[in-house]
Amino acid sequence: MLKITFMTMMLIPTTLILKPKMLYQTTTSYSFMIALFSLSLLEPNSNTYLHLDSTSAPLLLLSYWLMPMTMMASQHAMNKEPLQRQRTFLSILTLLQLFISLTFMASNITLMYIMFEATLIPTLIIITRWGQQTERLTAGTYFMMYTLTTSMPLLTAILFINNTTNTPTLFMQMMQTTSPWTELMLWIACLGAFLAKMPVYGLHLWLPKAHVEAPIAGSMVLAAILLKLGGYGIIRMTQILPTMKTDLFLPFIVLSLWGATLANLTCLQQTDLKSLIAYSSVSHMGLVIAATMIQTQWSLSGAMALMIAHGFTSSALFCLANTTYERTKTRIMILTRGFHSILPMITTWWLMTNLMNIATPPSINFTGELLIASSLFNWCPTTIILFGLSMLITASYSLHMLLSTQTGTPTLNMVTYPTHSREHLLMVLHILPLMLISLKPELII
């Protein structure tokens, strides 16, 4: 684990001293090498400070795999920037990756909290410095306020747990039962921060703003990894805190399922492509929240599968939206129509990614949603109404997104250049792991 961490750390000075001509080739290939080395981390591993198990290893692997892809995706936009800013951008991306990986590796909740909150700063810089419109400052403010407001109770809860147990609380050990009132306050304090990060419907307003204003690398990292920190945190807290009573997690499950349905309905009325994909993330994370709250073996396996699947799928959708944006300079879906006759290969990628997003079998998205649906139905048969409605609307807006961007008459007031092999490679590296994991889901479940 330390080897991989040091390799990632050394990428920061590398980006700062490389020759301009070699900057992207070297950093991308170096980070691909780190991604391949990180495959060895799938085996459980533990020492005093760092700890990996079947919950954190797949998410850690996902974060390392997406790091070179964020560099590749932002290459076109970054080439227009001065060299020093390109170096700074790559360094901040690497720093963000370092904080994320240490969050997943941390063996005690204090270190996990510090790294969890440290991810805020690089993400904020990426959104507010490299975003496209002036609204990026508002998006950055929303992101910061939601994160900081909910993280204060989490810090208080962690300090209380540390004082009660007289240890930095290794994840293997469960806290002794205190009074019911204390338990309730601890759960609400811990869940607040992670639910805002997921985000649950109601605490989600920062997400569409951040996604729409962030550059492509920021959108990819936000959708694929930063949202998963919330799910990972909830799973970790269920291992430490005393077992939840049904009357506490019932409102959260209802809120997350109803929120998923409402987010899906919001998707149907979106005109902005990135905003639609962002609301789609809110609905998928609603299912993950519901699954983690039930705390059965099946539901946790389903939550893990859906988190990994959503990481690849949403990141791929943002890459495709960016490919369209680079050519049309607009995110409005009605202005980006008719791409099937201009870029037919990109239409194929759109179709495959949307099918993954709908969760058609035999994709890993389907495996995750099937496990979640089974555990929800077993827990309370009525939940199938909200779940089924959510699935139906997901299929509707995914097909609407595909048809409105790819079919129809092209707008003829723009010059469209052909796709680069870089963009095709980017899509292959998103979709290939999804297909391979679908063949062997026990790697992540």
Swiss-Prot record:
One of its GO terms (cellular component) is mitochondrial membrane. Pfam families: Oxidored_q5_N (PF01059), Proton_antipo_M (PF00361). InterPro entries: NADH4_N (IPR000260), NADH_Q_OxRdtase_chainM/4 (IPR010227), NADH_UbQ_OxRdtase (IPR003918), ND/Mrp_TM (IPR001750). Its EC number is 7.1.1.2. It catalyses: a ubiquinone + NADH + 5 H(+)(in) = a ubiquinol + NAD(+) + 4 H(+)(out). It is found in: Mitochondrion membrane. It is a multi-pass membrane protein. One of its GO terms (biological process) is electron transport coupled proton transport. Keywords: Electron transport, Membrane, Mitochondrion, NAD, Respiratory chain, Translocase, Transmembrane, Transmembrane helix, Transport, Ubiquinone. The chain crosses the membrane at residues 22-42, 54-74, 87-107, 108-128, 141-161, 186-206, 215-235, 248-268, 276-296, 300-320, 332-352, 383-403, 425-445. Disulfide bonds: none annotated. The keyword Cell cycle does not apply. One of its GO terms (molecular function) is ubiquinone binding. Belongs to the complex I subunit 4 family. PANTHER family: NADH-UBIQUINONE OXIDOREDUCTASE CHAIN 4. Core subunit of the mitochondrial membrane respiratory chain NADH dehydrogenase (Complex I) that is believed to belong to the minimal assembly required for catalysis. Complex I functions in the transfer of electrons from NADH to the respiratory chain. The immediate electron acceptor for the enzyme is believed to be ubiquinone. This is NADH-ubiquinone oxidoreductase chain 4. It comes from Lycodon semicarinatus.
